[in-house]
């Protein structure tokens, strides 16, 4: 299911540069430069010594994407530049906060950093918000609220100490969200250590509200890494960075989906979309031919060729695996060359093979929620 989300919901077109195969550890100096070492060390795993160098498991991807940008000179014509990846991150969360795949010490997140000019902030924030809310439509997420997360000015230890930068960043993000017509509340002390952020919080079926998506405005890290671009007048300027996470931790998002759907995923998202159930060995050959046709059509299909009674196979597929569609194939179906289609509700319909394939592929294409 994670692969489906990555391939279908988080398209490469949202990024100019897609990072793959990045090391899960980095030199300690990167986190010291970014400020993570000073402001986030209690949530990081201890440093490791290897061949005379000190490395840490990366808790975030910001420093690495900064270094990709810094790898070559840039002009204002190059901006906005979007660097994204499906990243493996590691955070030493306290044991009391751990909660299955919803909150662990190792997780995958869809993460991107958008490098832009100050004039491009509004359009980039708008694009991020549109991408977030369009993605929510795909998953039928309607119960959410937007929060402008600000720093606590009195907490100098938690936040980068630059009042002018913070005032500028908070006012800029507040102004953009207001202009975009996004209704939001403000919460003090919830910002990232380097800048304010828009948090989109959801209320899961079980448990407390949590942040699913973020868009963070950052004037701090580009300056710390001495990032520049050449402007129209030939002068060097520092870019602004937006930290974008459309679905945040994919592990947490899968936990959210499991709770919301009770494991009954829509056809387009289900790990197995169709399960083929031959009644006996006599219809196994026909079942195999149907399975091949579904595979050729791009359907995720599984063939249950175990020597079990058909009632057992149906219960396992419907109640345990919660597969959207089951094809019960007996002698009657094999002789007629058609299908007995059973859905999760237990309703059974006789359909032609091509008719069923067209139905399933249309549900996948349109991301329908009708089963």
Regions found by a protein language model. Give the residues of each.
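NTP/phosphate- and nucleic-acid-binding module
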Residues: 1-371
């Amino acid at each position: 299911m994670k692969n489906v989300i990555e391939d279908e919901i988080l398209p490469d077109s949202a990024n100019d540069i897609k990072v793959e195969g990045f090391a899960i550890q980095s030199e300690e100096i990167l986190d010291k430069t970014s400020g993570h070492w000073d402001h986030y060390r209690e949530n990081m795993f201890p440093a490791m010594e290897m061949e005379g160098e000190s490395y840490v498991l990366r808790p975030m991807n910001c420093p690495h994407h900064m270094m990709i940008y810094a790898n070559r000179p840039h002009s204002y014509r190059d901006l906005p530049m979007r660097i994204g990846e499906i990243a493996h991150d590691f955070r030493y969360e306290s044991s009391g906060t751990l909660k299955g795949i919803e909150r662990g010490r190792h997780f995958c997140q869809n993460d991107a950093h958008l490098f832009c000019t100050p004039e491009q902030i509004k359009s980039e924030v708008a694009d991020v918000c549109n991408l977030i809310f369009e993605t929510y439509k795909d998953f039928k997420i309607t119960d959410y609220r937007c929060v402008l997360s600000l720093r606590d000015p009195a907490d100098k230890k938690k936040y980068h100490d630059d009042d002018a930068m913070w005032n500028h960043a908070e006012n800029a993000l507040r102004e953009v969200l207001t202009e975009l017509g996004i209704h939001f509340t403000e919460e003090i002390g919830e910002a990232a250590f380097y800048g304010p952020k828009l948090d989109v919080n959801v209320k899961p079926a079980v448990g407390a509200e949590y942040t699913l998506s973020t868009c963070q405005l950052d004037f701090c890290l580009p300056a710390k890494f001495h990032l520049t671009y050449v402007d129209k007048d030939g002068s060097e300027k520092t870019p602004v960075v937006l930290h974008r996470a459309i679905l945040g931790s994919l592990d947490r998002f899968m936990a959210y989906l499991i709770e919301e759907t009770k494991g009954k995923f829509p056809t387009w998202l289900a790990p197995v979309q169709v399960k083929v159930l031959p009644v006996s060995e006599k219809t196994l050959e026909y079942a195999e031919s149907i399975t091949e046709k579904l595979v050729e059509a791009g359907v995720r299909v599984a063939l249950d060729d175990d020597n079990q009674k058909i009632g057992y196979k149906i219960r396992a597929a419907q109640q345990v695996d919660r597969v959207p569609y089951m094809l019960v194939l007996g002698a009657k179906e094999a002789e007629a060359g058609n299908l007995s289609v059973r859905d999760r509700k237990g309703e059974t319909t006789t359909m032609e093979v091509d008719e069923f394939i067209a139905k399933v592929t249309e549900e996948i294409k349109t991301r329908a929620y009708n089963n």
